[in-house]
Swiss-Prot record:
Species: Cereibacter sphaeroides (strain ATCC 17023 / DSM 158 / JCM 6121 / CCUG 31486 / LMG 2827 / NBRC 12203 / NCIMB 8253 / ATH 2.4.1.) (Rhodobacter sphaeroides)
Gene name of the encoded protein: moaC
Residues noted as binding substrate in the record, renumbered to the chain: 75-77, 113-114
Protein name: Cyclic pyranopterin monophosphate synthase
Keyword Translocase appears in the UniProt entry: no
Reaction(s) catalysed (UniProt annotation): (8S)-3',8-cyclo-7,8-dihydroguanosine 5'-triphosphate = cyclic pyranopterin phosphate + diphosphate
Pfam family, one: MoaC
Lineage of origin: Bacteria, Pseudomonadati, Pseudomonadota, Alphaproteobacteria, Rhodobacterales
Assembly description: Homohexamer; trimer of dimers.
Domain of life: Bacteria
EC supergroup of this enzyme: lyase
Active site (UniProt): 128
Record's keyword annotation contains Iron: no
Length: 159
């Protein structure tokens, strides 16, 4: 299974040994969105959702999700995360909320999964907090936008 680092020579899943890799500065940025009706978006942006501050709670949930990534994704290394920041932006053209997460560490492996988990958990939290008024919302477009640091260098997603 050449190229797939989470499998050994026999094809069995294993956690990659990063003990010999140098500690370097690493950053990852991910993005996703929750599409909803304009009416539901107004509830969110005007602070009228029954469960409270949707965007504030989703931001905290995303931060918590990034910190718990190694508990959720079986082969992820627990990392000393040094920064998690989430931007949640209402987009009337979508309509919906765009979520972008930036995660940083000084470590031996990257924080791509932490950034993707932060976005996913924030989007799920938005859905949870307003599902009572709209069950047909769509979580969409979750992807890695940027990865820097480590042996493989810089990755930037195409537009």
């Amino acid at each position: 299974m050449s190229g797939l680092t989470h499998f050994d020579e026999s094809g069995r899943a294993h956690m990659v040994d990063v003990s010999e890799k140098p500690v370097t500065a690493r950053v990852a940025v991910a993005r996703g969105a929750v599409k909803m009706s304009a009416e539901t978006l107004a509830l969110v942006t005007e602070g009228r959702a029954e469960k409270g501050d949707v965007l504030g709670v989703a931001r905290l949930a995303g931060i918590m999700g990034a910190k718990r990534t190694a508990d959720l994704i079986p082969l992820c290394h627990p990392l000393p995360i040094t920064k998690v920041a989430l931007e949640l932006t209402a987009d009337p053209a979508l309509p919906g909320v765009v979520v972008e997460a930036t995660v940083k560490t000084g470590g031996q492996t990257g924080v791509e999964m932490e950034a993707l988990t932060a976005v996913s958990v924030a989007c799920l939290t938005i859905y949870d907090m307003v599902k009572a008024v709209e069950k047909g919302m769509e979580i969409t477009g979750i992807r890695l936008l940027l990865k820097e640091g480590g042996k493989s260098g810089r990755f930037e997603a195409s537009a």
